[in-house]
Amino acid sequence: KGAIDKIFERFEDCPSDYHLLYQLPTGGGKTIIFSEIVRQYLKLKKKKVVVLTHRIELCNQTSKVLSDFGVLNKVVNSKASLDDQEQYSCFVAMVETLNNRLLDDKLDISDVGLVIIDEAHYNSFTKLLKFFSSSFILGVTATPLSSNINLPMTDNYDELIVGESISELIKNNFLARANLYTYNVGLTSLIVGANGDYTVKSSEELYTNNDMLSKLLLAYEER
């Protein structure tokens, strides 16, 4: 509630095109929080909302959570018809799909007051900011460090609000205390990027492949 109150203070006190970044650890409930923000915003502001994600799985998951909060929303994918867009106050989309729809002038965003960017540290979202020059941008992420060292997040956001830490979330029973186990796995396919960390692409390719997921399941069953 404290985070939501802070964010709504910015809605009231800051310019309508303000860019705010909100950080909360993984598992802290970012989707729940911004779904409640959308619900309250639509009631208060009477403007439309766009929620951006970077993966189709997150797109569908976000749409479901928004629906659970009573927010009538539409997923904008490559197959979706937008003839009924006037019936919706909230749209959920991935970057490339929305970019193509906007370039083709298929989606009316003239009444969009708020854009929420999930996993905002991914730089692919920046290409869409030009379409929402008059909208309030709310980025949410667990890691407020840009995926590209040459494109720092300070270039796109005016302020950072830091949420509760992992230890605070555990203490307040929002997160469970983790039991940690380690296994030796091959990491030779990981590529080090310009910022000294492994690239997002090589990490996703390694940790989401079937062999790695099978090892994860086996490790869980052994414990």
Regions found by a protein language model. Give the residues of each.
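N-terminal pre-P-loop "Q-motif" helix
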Residues: K1-S16
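Walker A/P-loop
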Residues: C14-I37
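Conserved Walker A/P-loop ATP-binding site and its immediately adjacent core
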Residues: T31-I33, L42-D68
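Conserved RecA-like helicase motor-core motifs
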Residues: S63, G70-L82
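Conserved helix/coil segment N-terminal to the catalytic DExD/H
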Residues: A80-D111, Y122-T126
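Conserved Walker B
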Residues: V112, E119-H121, S203
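Post-DEXD/H (motif II) to motif III coupling segment of the RecA-like Helicase ATP-binding lobe
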Residues: L114, H121-L180
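Conserved interdomain linker/interface between the two RecA-like ATPase lobes of SF2 helicase motors
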Residues: L160-R223
